[in-house]
Amino acid sequence: MATPTPDDIANDVQERSNTALKRGLASRHMQMIAIGGAIGTGLFLASGATVANAGPGGALVAYAAIGLMVLLLMQSLGEMSAHQPVAGSFQTFATKFISPSFGFAMGWNYWFNWAVTVAADLVASGLVMAYWFPSVPSWIWAVGFLVIVVGLNALSARVYGEAEFWLAAIKVVIVIVFVLSGVFMIAGVMGENSPGLSNWTIGDAPFHNGFVGVIAVFMIAGFSFQGTELVGVAAGESENPRRDVPRSIRTVFWRIMFFYIGAIAVIGTLLPYTDPSLLSAADDSANNIAQSPFTLVFARMGIGAAAAVMNAVILTSILSAGNSGLYAASRMLHSMALKRQAPAIFARVTKGGVPAYAMAVTTVTAALGFRTQLVFNDAYIWLVNIVGISGIIMWLGIAVSHIRFRRAYLLQGYRLEDLPYRSPFFPAGPIIAFVMCLVVMAGQNYEAVLHGQVWEVASSYIGLPLFGVVWWGYHVARKDRVVPLAEMDVAPVEIEPVTH
């Protein structure tokens, strides 16, 4: 092999400086990114639908089960991310530990998921603002929302992290106040007369619709927890990922579980599952902010401006989701470009370490998705359904990647004691999570399957064959193979020191 010349070395250094992200996320940023990613409109609006569909007991069981699954998956992701803290996170792991074609499909699947999610956030921003300004066209608010999100992402990872820290903090405070106030209401200390536990015994509560009801809630609960993987994506820009990733995995999950389980318990105890407002709150309408279970409970406390307060909180949730969505999508595209799984231009970064071209194409895609909703609503619904199942595919990939990583790590002579963080549940953890992911995926729209509603089934599961086509297409084009255990790159990734 020829010895590199000084010019070769200089060119390599220049190329790395043009494509290298900067580690600017502190420990507090990492923890709030994970929390903020998991607490959003799914909790503030859709949580009521889970109680309506499964009863208070069924909703609690569903969220606890999905929470367990996510815990196992985050343990797996934490082990790999602390060992190899790269921006591509699980997509890089899928490429290294499964096959390049699977990683390729997983990366583009994840990027498209967040690009369309940002588009959905643009739609939601217009709906929320219509609560206060019904006569103003929704596209005006969407443009303003997009400008804010792009501005927060365009400066640096640290600015993004700081914005997400405070946006997530608002949501955390509201949920804590909600849960504690709910406990006081149940105890009869404040608000109207306490219903006690009567709402757990009306009708066929606590398990309305039985096992079928729990399965129906699995998908809602699963979507609610999506976003916790952002801590893995952000590992590539963490100041100290070997410390902060495990810390975030260990502490953040239990906080998220407290928020969800606590909120669902309060909603199911204070509001009967037969209340029609619980279902209508999940519909896409500005008027239904007043039907949010959070709004209903706050109103019972005597807070007259409950709807306006929750509207403001939901707006911050949408901004937080859009902020994180643009961040995650642009980092994923940047990571794939470094592996030549996306056009090389997307690997370029600004002096602040921001992948500007990757961010730009994500922004344009989100804007087009928003435009599609305005003109072709049916097409937009299909887009949303395509990405709806992508989170489950991502989780499946994490489980398989971890199993193969651990096997290769030991086969190649490495010691478990040298891992910065070790999942305490291996090998049962990723196996159980894998099976649960399959159950959640199968139950995505079981009613349509049972009733033979072909169009609904196709709309719900279209993401699966599309993922398969991308996976197989890359496999055929590149003639790749499943990476043998002995050839896997499981060596620890060197971390350059952070300078301020």
Regions found by a protein language model. Give the residues of each.
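Membrane-interface "cap" regions at the ends of multi-pass membrane proteins
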Residues: 1-48, 52-57, 70-75, 87, ...
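Membrane-helix boundary/coupling elements in multi-pass transport proteins
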Residues: 86, 109-124, 220, 225-238, ...
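Extracellular loop-to-transmembrane helix junctions
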Residues: 21-22, 46-141, 145, 151, ...
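Helix-loop-helix junctions that connect adjacent transmembrane segments
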Residues: 12-22, 60, 137, 169-311
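A generic transmembrane alpha-helix motif of multi-pass inner-membrane proteins
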Residues: 185-186, 381-394, 423-500
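TM-loop-TM module centered on a large, flexible mid-protein loop between adjacent transmembrane helices
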Residues: 92, 99, 131, 217, ...
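Membrane-interface loop-to-helix entry segments
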Residues: 126, 139-197, 226, 249-253, ...
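C-terminal membrane-solvent junction of multi-pass transporters and transport-like membrane proteins
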Residues: 166-167, 346-356, 395-455
